[in-house]
A protein has these predicted regions:
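Preference for long, amphipathic alpha-helical scaffolds in soluble/luminal domains
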Residues: 1-318
Length: 318
């Protein structure tokens, strides 16, 4: 079995994206497999888990009743990934058809009933955290909701060095890779949907420059790797940064590759296994409804799909 056959012999969420990104399949064939995501496999399972209150696990960012005793979760402590925000974000990553009846009904329930734990604000109105707001912009664009107000807030929160930081409201003046990639994904989606303004485009470009001038994973001052964990690839991506996530961002933006990503691409190539696959390396800890791969250290259909389409973009555009 070839690597492509291995990916095609999978859940509709992987199959349709592999057909679109790695083959010459017809538009009709791709659309037919994509339509299955809402009715079969992972996508259908997630939709079925929405509660009668219109939320997943009874909450927006966190499940009902969950609290962190020492503040927000970090990269190692984990958090539940079963609430509304991570579930909708996973449905986006699965590429579920936002126009399907099942999805429209689910998103309408979120818009009507889900409110953030912070200040009891409506879900698609955003809240005060830049990472959360960036992801909510991406979700709003994908699922056809009005998120103009969140975009305006994010534009006003961009830091002098070009990025964003969730802790800027507590006085931090230095950008975070994590916050920046989440906001960039939202702004890029907003722009690709035709809603971008001169101001949002300029902000997006400044944010990209923040990553590019650091070669996606290095300190600007010394050239040292910022965090070795970012060299290990995760899926689902959740909120943390890693190099493959950044490469996927630039691929989706569809601009010609900037030479400053060359080192990141070489890292990606170095991780291909002798059988042609890439591994799942850094699963973010926390409760999930069900796994999407076989675990860290095992071949990952998701990371293989993502790596191959990055390399296809990089090789086809450079």
């Amino acid at each position: 079995m070839t690597v492509l056959d291995w990916m095609l012999d999978s859940d509709p969420a992987i199959r349709w994206q592999a057909l679109r990104d790695l083959t010459d399949a017809s538009t009709d064939d791709v659309a037919a497999d994509r339509a299955r995501v809402a009715t079969e496999g992972w996508g259908a399972r997630l939709l079925a888990l929405q509660g009668e209150d219109g939320q997943w696990a009874g909450g927006a960012c966190f499940p009902a009743g969950w609290s962190a005793s020492d503040g927000p979760p970090d990269e190692t402590s984990g958090q539940p990934w079963t609430s509304t925000l991570p579930t909708l974000h996973l449905l986006l990553e699965l590429g579920i058809d936002p126009g399907s009846e099942q999805v429209r009904r689910a998103v309408a329930q979120v818009a009507d009933h889900c409110r953030w734990e912070c200040d009891d604000l409506p879900f698609f109105g955003g809240e005060e955290d830049a990472c959360i707001n960036g992801r909510t912009v991406a979700l709003g664009v994908y699922f056809g909701q009005d998120i103009d107000g969140i975009v305006a807030r994010l534009l006003g929160e961009q830091l002098e060095d070009g990025g964003w930081n969730c802790y800027a409201r507590f006085g931090s003046g230095r950008s975070s890779y994590h916050s920046t990639i989440n906001v960039l994904e939202g702004l890029s989606a907003y722009e690709r949907a035709g809603a971008g303004s001169a101001e949002s485009i300029a902000a997006r470009r400044r944010g990209e420059e923040y990553l590019l001038e650091r070669n996606l994973f290095r300190r600007k001052s010394t050239g040292e790797v910022v965090n070795p964990d970012w060299l290990r690839f995760s899926f689902p991506t959740r909120w943390p940064y890693d190099v493959l996530r950044a490469l996927e961002y630039f691929r989706a933006a569809a601009d010609p590759p900037d030479k400053r990503i060359n080192g990141a691409v070489e890292l990606l190539r170095s991780k291909q296994q002798p059988d042609g696959t890439w591994l799942l390396e850094n699963t973010h800890p926390g409760d999930v409804y069900f796994p999407l791969d076989d675990g860290d250290g095992r071949p990952s259909r998701w990371n293989t799909l993502r790596a191959l389409r990055v390399l296809r973009w990089y090789g086809g555009s450079s």
